[in-house]
Regions:
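Cytoplasmic-side transmembrane-helix entry/capping segments in multi-pass membrane proteins
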Residues: 13, 17-18, 79-87, 135-147, ...
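Structural motif at transmembrane-helix junctions in multi-pass transporters
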Residues: 38-50, 98-116, 192-194
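Hydrophobic/aromatic residues within transmembrane alpha-helices
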Residues: 34, 51, 103, 108, ...
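Transmembrane alpha-helices of multi-pass small-molecule transport proteins
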Residues: 37-94, 122, 126, 176-183, ...
């Protein structure tokens, strides 16, 4: 019997989960710093799409390189799975992060992180419908508590007025994140999860780059500091 992966060891789950949460929290200020580093204005939609595309294309290639070094299988079943992988990249990366970058750049960081968390609650509910997963009292209570927090934040006196360019884009991002989460379950049943993630990031980034150029983005000198 083969040795279990460290990722399957329950003792390490809190560490990995905490690291993932911390990394995701850092995304909000780092995106703002990156946009500022490249001089991308708040109204420059094309520039934001180009910036996001460059970052995700680079991230996807790095993930695929790691997968190769780890000896992961790159086999992609023919037929429907390949189209599902393309849809995965379009929804989970291209559309999700197009809306996400627009929203984050036009919304306060703390508020953006709270609105973005809506995707998690939507995914729990959607998975119960699509995959017939049982909703426990704990998960229902968690969703209600989370939704209540989002509503209170947006109704609070310090929240400011709802904006389509900020809050609206983040809500669209959350819906795409929910759809991407469902597609993740479908695609990773038929191919390696790490390889699927790498393909999704690279493909989504490759779609965002020409989209940004078509929207009038003007490429500037690439700086690794800004991309990171």
């Amino acid at each position: 019997m083969g040795r279990a992966s460290v990722f399957e060891n329950r003792k390490w789950v809190p560490l990995f989960a905490g690291s993932a949460a911390l990394s995701w929290a850092c995304a909000f200020p780092l995106i703002k710093l990156g946009l500022a580093d490249f001089g991308i204005a708040g109204t420059d939609t094309g520039g934001k799409a180009l910036f996001a595309g460059a970052r995700f294309l680079l991230a996807g290639l790095v993930v695929l390189a790691v997968a190769k070094l780890c000896g992961r299988s790159f086999a992609v079943p023919r037929g429907k799975t390949r189209w599902q992988l393309v849809l995965f990249g379009l929804v989970n990366t291209a559309l999700h992060y197009f809306f996400f970058y627009l929203g984050v750049s036009n919304s306060p960081g703390g508020r953006a992180s709270i609105l973005d968390s809506l995707g998690t609650f939507l995914l729990i509910l959607a998975a119960a419908v699509v995959f017939r997963e049982k909703l426990t009292l704990r998960s229902i209570f968690g969703c209600l508590l989370g939704f209540s927090g989002i509503v209170l934040i947006n109704l609070g006196s310090t929240a400011g007025q709802f904006t389509l360019s900020g809050d609206g884009m983040l809500l669209c991002s959350s819906v795409c994140a929910m759809a991407g989460g469902l597609l993740t379950r479908v695609v990773t049943r038929k191919m390696d999860p790490l390889v699927a993630t790498g393909h999704s990031l690279a493909l989504g980034g490759a779609l965002l780059i020409p989209a940004g150029l078509l929207m009038g983005a003007h490429p500037v000198g690439v700086r690794l500091q800004g991309l990171l």
